[in-house]
């Protein structure tokens, strides 16, 4: 029997990419779902398909996580009506590429609110009932950018570093109360993130599929790992960075961006 069969998972940013793959793979494993993103119409079409294919319950919550009221709204429509969440997947987020001083400040502050503030708020809301039940788990979608500062992705890499260290600390706080916390750190993945952000030419390595990334994330939390790097090449790079001065890794990343002549000002997409 599947580890997730009969359990209920909440996936944020579920309309595209990694979030959509989390929803599809969890439903295929027999999990009931609550899926949320701004695009309610797309979510409702997904929900109908998943219900038909896998005979699971799928609830749709249209919510903009840039709205401070959204985490409470999502909580009220799940735990608040007797639908306990066994797994929270904090996936919603976005990135931007460009010189920090040239990128719009309001968008960079929105990035912090979505990638960090909403993630913390949702974790705080849903962790409490998990701890009371002494059962559950949270997956935070971070990035390989969490392991060093990334020039031209300065705010984005900083938000993902927060997600990683927050997850590692929370995992230890919760381990004796039978709640698992895990950070999933993917590298280049075949979503629309790089294309819209203007970085599609940056990495010539073979990207992973969202399904490969999600499989790694689910395996990690099932095994109680506090973080996992998805993909052998990404694991090698993340491991090797431990042996180099931080300034070396940061400057190497800057040279790579300059080599590919990325736009010095631009916007990235929301992952959800």
Model-derived features: where do they sit?
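Active-site helix of classical SDR
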Residues: 123, 159
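Conserved glycine-rich cofactor-binding loop
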Residues: 8, 15-16
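SDR active-site lid
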Residues: 171-236, 247, 269-270
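Conserved NAD(P)H cofactor-binding loop of Rossmann-fold oxidoreductase domains
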Residues: 91-96
């Amino acid at each position: 029997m599947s580890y997730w069969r009969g359990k209920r998972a909440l996936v944020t940013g579920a309309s595209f990419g990694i979030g959509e793959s989390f929803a599809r793979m969890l439903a295929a494993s027999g999990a009931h779902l609550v899926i949320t993103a701004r695009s309610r119409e797309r979510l409702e079409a997904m929900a109908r398909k998943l219900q038909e294919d896998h005979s699971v319950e799928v609830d749709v919550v249209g919510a903009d996580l840039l709205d401070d009221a959204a985490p409470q709204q999502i909580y009220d429509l799940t735990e608040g009506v007797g639908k306990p969440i066994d797994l929270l997947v904090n996936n919603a987020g976005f990135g931007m590429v460009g010189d920090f001083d040239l990128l719009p400040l309001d968008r960079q502050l929105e990035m912090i609110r979505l990638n960090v503030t909403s993630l913390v708020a949702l974790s705080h809301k849903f962790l409490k009932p998990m701890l009371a039940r002494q059962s559950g788990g949270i997956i935070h979608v971070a990035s390989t950018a969490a392991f060093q500062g990334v020039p031209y992705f300065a705010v984005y890499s900083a938000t993902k570093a927060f997600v990683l260290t927050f997850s590692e600390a929370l995992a230890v706080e919760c381990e004796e109360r039978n709640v698992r916390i895990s950070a999933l750190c993917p590298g280049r993945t075949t979503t629309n993130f790089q294309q819209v952000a203007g970085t599609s030419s940056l990495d010539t390595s073979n990207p992973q599929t969202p399904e490969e990334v999600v499989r790694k994330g689910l395996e990690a939390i099932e095994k109680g790992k506090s973080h996992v790097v998805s993909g052998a090449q990404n694991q090698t790079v993340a491991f090797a960075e431990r042996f180099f001065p931080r300034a070396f890794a940061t400057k190497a990343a800057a040279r790579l961006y300059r080599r590919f002549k990325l736009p010095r000002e631009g916007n990235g997409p929301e992952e959800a």
